[in-house]
Amino acid sequence: MGAALKMTIFLLIVACAMIATTEAAVRIGPCDQVCPRIVPERHECCRAHGRSGYAYCSGGGMYCN
């Protein structure tokens, strides 16, 4: 395969993985105040609200997987 085709396939796989992660994340309002804190505290808040762990913070809202 050519280098361009390999790169295109790789980028498609990365994009699909990012979409799957983003789509699985759910905003957890009570954890919004934890966004500025360290990552272990974010994970703990998500787990305390029945989720598997911290995904990301965006616009002051915390999203958990």
Swiss-Prot record:
GO terms for biological process: antifungal humoral response; killing of cells of another organism. Coiled coil: none annotated. Keywords: Antimicrobial, Calcium channel impairing toxin, Disulfide bond, Fungicide, Ion channel impairing toxin, Secreted, Signal, Toxin, Voltage-gated calcium channel impairing toxin. GO terms for molecular function: calcium channel inhibitor activity; toxin activity. Disulfide bonds join C31-C45, C35-C57, C46-C64. It comes from the Eukaryota. It is found in: Secreted. Has antifungal activity against T.rubrum. Blocks voltage-dependent N-type calcium channels (Cav2.2 / CACNA1B). This is Diapause-specific peptide.
